[in-house]
Amino acid sequence: MYFCWGADSRELQRRRTAGSPGAELLQAASGERHSLLLLTNHRVLSCGDNSRGQLGRRGAQRGELPEPIQALETLIVDLVSCGKEHSLAVCHKGRVFAWGAGSEGQLGIGEFKEISFTPKKIMTLNDIKIIQVSCGHYHSLALSKDSQVFSWGKNSHGQLGLGKEFPSQASPQRVRSLEGIPLAQVAAGGAHSFALSLCGTSFGWGSNSAGQLALSGRNVPVQSNKPLSVGALKNLGVVYISCGDAHTAVLTQDGKVFTFGDNRSGQLGYSPTPEKRGPQLVERIDGLVSQIDCGSYHTLAYVHTTGQVVSFGHGPSDTSKPTHPEALTENFDISCLISAEDFVDVQVKHIFAGTYANFVTTHQDTSSTRAPGKTLPEISRISQSMAEKWIAVKRRSTEHEMAKSEIRMIFSSPACLTASFLKKRGTGETTSIDVDLEMARDTFKKLTKKEWISSMITTCLEDDLLRALPCHSPHQEALSVFLLLPECPVMHDSKNWKNLVVPFAKAVCEMSKQSLQVLKKCWAFLQESSLNPLIQMLKAAIISQLLHQTKTEQDHCNVKALLGMMKELHKVNKANCRLPENTFNINELSNLLNFYIDRGRQLFRDNHLIPAETPSPVIFSDFPFIFNSLSKIKLLQADSHIKMQMSEKKAYMLMHETILQKKDEFPPSPRFILRVRRSRLVKDALRQLSQAEATDFCKVLVVEFINEICPESGGVSSEFFHCMFEEMTKPEYGMFMYPEMGSCMWFPAKPKPEKKRYFLFGMLCGLSLFNLNVANLPFPLALYKKLLDQKPSLEDLKELSPRLGKSLQEVLDDAADDIGDALCIRFSIHWDQNDVDLIPNGISIPVDQTNKRDYVSKYIDYIFNVSVKAVYEEFQRGFYRVCEKEILRHFYPEELMTAIIGNTDYDWKQFEQNSKYEQGYQKSHPTIQLFWKAFHKLTLDEKKKFLFFLTGRDRLHARGIQKMEIVFRCPETFSERDHPTSITCHNILSLPKYSTMERMEEALQVAINNNRGFVSPMLTQS
């Protein structure tokens, strides 16, 4: 049973469906002058005007009573919709049939046909399962099972949502702006359209001449050619949208109705005023609403708490005569309440509004307390029961085929996958992330335990979903799929890095700027449990590509995409500090990457030595966050070697040019040679450094100790730097101050040496680093922070002066109100034998709870910055005259410190294991056995002195840079009377074949006590 009313009668007309015993009215739809009735047996009846073929049959111009549409009799029809003069029907297989007026393309049959009397299948949609359709006056919308929206028909106001310059369309077109968004509904009005997402976001497009899109802000357009997210509806909790000719009504989760648009007929439910624009609550409705529906110029609402059907607005005023039996009067203001008393013994099921006609379906069950709402067909998504069914199905069964079909659809559609894990909607502010990643992770884990499901998911992602990712969508709901995919185990399978992870990363890199910003905001809210696996997935793919070699242009493009995505993630993490920085380090790079080639490419590119049209290879150095400390030092070494080689090549070219042109002047040396006397070491070295040109520092450094036999080896320069720093950092030398006994050193507040000496000392430090040397420079970490433009902290002061740092910490921790009086603290300090006010008249300003943090901050700033400004700036200027700041900025302070001073984490057992044996020696040789036994008896200081004898330094490079080892040799000319000798640049120890422990211990002491100088190639016992 159903009720209808409209034109000539204020009374409800109670009707039963004719010609279909036992069938009830399931759905009704009305155009301007015709109606469709869909029955529960899936037959479609039509009545009204047929001048444009809108009844779906030939013959009479009008159908006074509802009659079946014969062309649809063989179909199981699930949905119907009416435009002004055209009709649509959807069968249970999702096929769409159209008939009626088609001059604007609104039938979607591929031609602008004036009239189509019989329903025709829309062939463009033949392979797509449509679950919803909605007709505007002259256009149509369809929603597919996989959440695609199609539009066709008239586009004079942009109501198709296809963008600018699109004419009317005779075939369905995808509304690409909505791709990836899990949708709940589509609704068409006169010349405007809406879509509602499962998250509750409303998207409107088309005509906005009367404000029917609810767009806000300055310069509101009169039409929109693309779907726009309607901000005014965002936080209302919209669950249903209905559109009239030029007005719109929305129903919220809490049973309220908001309307907007044209109000000339009172269709918005409040007094017509031109000032009221945007969504307005219909306050006159007394109770909670569960259904709404818009006619062209009026609105219906079912108030389930009172059992009333509320109607406001009226039919168009230009109608001159009755239309059909379902709407018998003209120009009638139907703003009234239809009482629950009219529905005796029945309960309202659904309401439907047309231009003139209104329908109410009922059911007999009056005991139900559940609010009857309109249940719309939904897009595909995974439910827990569905997942369990998939896991349980037997292979080759009917259920198995159905499961495969469901999996194929969901895992091929970004929107369906997102819909599967949406968080429960609320009526308040939207959550930071729309999807439940923990639920997704658990579901994917269960599903992929089944090999056939895992294989299907992989295929669907590779063939369809990754190609359909909404890279240019500005909507968070569409981009949520980028959060879900990394939760799936198949994305982490080592076999899938190239076919899944690389395309995924490329999609991120191809995003529009706006889309990427939205995605990055989502990344910023990720928990460690989601963010870390995402990073590990990318790292694993990069390693896999490197293991497969990076030769082709495509290989380089793959790595660029992976690194590009990691770069964006790194930016997000840096701003939010979710994960430690070293999470992004790819430790394997230190062994897999050729740093010389990589740095060379970067230098060539930066110096414009590569033609612009040449395909550029990936340069890992452009992504320094992937480098661990070892990789950064190797990159620094590569940079030094390349620059030395370039400098040497340039010098030889100049020499060649000089010879050819017979020039008188002697060309510059290809080496940077320092000739120094050991007795005047510092003076000689600083004099020559001050005379050097900037280009000299890029050359290979050669140090010659005058009157000594100095092989061109790293060992000589290592000893040079060791001796220079040892001398210049002594307290008695006067360049640096030591706040406490055994503490680190720092720049003095009132230096005794001239400022230039600090400049030269900075050059010396830079030269040591550039030449890959490590030296003992007892500076605190604060120095390396300052070199990298970072601010020293209280922790740095604790390192420089433990006692002072501890006392300042106590000041911060002290909760007493009279802290300044109790401790006699003022804004005046004593530092480096000077009394200093931290602020003007600081001696008279006590420290209290309100200013103690400022006091500590100014104390730290004075020590590390204010007091040393002049001398530190000279030091920094000298340091960066040699070293390139661009490459050092990639280091963290701790890493730069390690690169400069090395480490003293000695592993003497490993030292023994790493060692090699040549010229008749082997590990089991008696002399070797004696050596290690004697060596391990030495004190730590003696072992360090022996290390200096062997290598020219008593410190180690950063772990992994250089093996700590000895290469044992026994020249035939050696006798037991000879002492051991070393070749420092190669860690070679020439060890005579001693036969007793006493002789071995004696020889080691000689080496330890004569570990400096190059007077003779061999120390021989007299």
Curated annotation (Swiss-Prot):
Q: What tissue expression does the UniProt record report for this protein? A: Detected in brain, heart, placenta and testis.
Gene Ontology cellular component list: cytoplasm; cytosol; nucleoplasm
Q: Where are the catalytic residues?
A: C985
Assigned keywords, A-Z: Cytoplasm, Repeat, Transferase, Ubl conjugation pathway
Q: Could you give a single Gene Ontology term from the biological process aspect?
A: response to bacterium
One MF term in the entry's GO annotations:
ubiquitin protein ligase activity
EC number annotated for this UniProt entry: 2.3.2.26
Does the entry feature the keyword Ribosomal protein, yes or no?
Answer: no
Q: Which SMART domains match?
A: HECTc (SM00119)
What are the RCC1 repeat spans here?
A: 41-92, 93-145, 147-198, 200-253, 254-304
Q: Which InterPro entries match?
A: HECT_dom (IPR000569), Hect_E3_ubiquitin_ligase (IPR035983), RCC1/BLIP-II (IPR009091), Reg_chr_condens (IPR000408), Ub-ligase/GTPase-reg (IPR051709)
**Biological pathway:** Protein modification; protein ubiquitination
Q: Can you give the residue ranges of the HECT domain?
A: 693-1017
Q: Does the keyword Repeat apply?
A: yes
Q: Give the catalytic activity.
A: S-ubiquitinyl-[E2 ubiquitin-conjugating enzyme]-L-cysteine + [acceptor protein]-L-lysine = [E2 ubiquitin-conjugating enzyme]-L-cysteine + N(6)-ubiquitinyl-[acceptor protein]-L-lysine
Query: Known Pfam families for this protein?
Result: HECT, WD40_RLD
Q: Where in the cell is it found?
A: Cytoplasm, Cytosol
Q: What does this protein do?
A: E3 ubiquitin-protein ligase which accepts ubiquitin from an E2 ubiquitin-conjugating enzyme in the form of a thioester and then directly transfers the ubiquitin to targeted substrates.
Recorded protein name is Probable E3 ubiquitin-protein ligase HERC6
Gene field: HERC6
